[in-house]
């Protein structure tokens, strides 16, 4: 099923033909929005998008397409936060396998304020709710990214503010969140 918050966009699961566009958007976001570029320890999934998101039935990459271009992404991976750098108590609370981690929620600058991120995150949460084995939906974000903190506070509950810990080093202010698990219904991604 496709979703569109705005008639000029198509929101759907990624296909192999979306990989290059999704990767380009992600790498551009690391450089222009976050200012630190590609970090292999943090961004392995970006190099192997097919293996990470398309080949695993419990993982998902969603894209928003506009005029044939990928302009927004959101991913779901079966993984919790890793200790270190994240606190041990978070790694224990959100274990791999039963945690759907929301990742790579990026919208190209010229396409913001159209409801793309919010709709993609809702689709990702619905996917987690209809995928067997997930008990929780977790994410962390760098609140230095423009609009990130307000956006996530409108959709999720803070579970730990790591800004004082410096867990990712200078220039990264991490806050950890949990999204309430939606009540399962028909699979919105596969319908």
Spans of features found by a protein language model:
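Conserved hydrophobic beta-strand within the GNAT/NAT acetyltransferase core sheet
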Residues: 102-105, 137-141
């Amino acid at each position: 099923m496709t979703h569109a918050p705005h008639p000029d966009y198509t929101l759907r699961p990624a296909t192999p033909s979306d990989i290059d566009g999704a990767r380009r958007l992600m790498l551009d976001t690391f450089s222009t929005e976050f200012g630190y570029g590609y970090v292999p320890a943090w961004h392995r999934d970006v190099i192997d998008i097919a293996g990470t998101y398309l080949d695993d039935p419990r993982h998902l990459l969603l894209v928003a397409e506009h005029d044939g271009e990928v302009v927004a992404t959101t991913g779901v991976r079966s993984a919790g936060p890793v200790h270190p750098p994240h606190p041990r108590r978070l790694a224990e609370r959100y274990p791999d396998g039963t945690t759907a981690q929301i990742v790579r929620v990026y919208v190209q600058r010229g396409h913001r304020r159209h409801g793309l991120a919010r709709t993609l995150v809702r689709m990702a949460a619905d996917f987690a709710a209809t995928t067997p084995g997930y008990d929780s939906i977790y994410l962390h974000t760098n609140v230095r990214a423009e609009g990130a903190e307000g956006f996530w506070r409108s959709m999720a509950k803070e579970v730990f503010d790591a800004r004082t810990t410096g867990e990712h080093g200078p220039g990264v202010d991490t806050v950890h969140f949990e999204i309430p698990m939606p009540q399962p219904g028909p699979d919105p991604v596969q319908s």
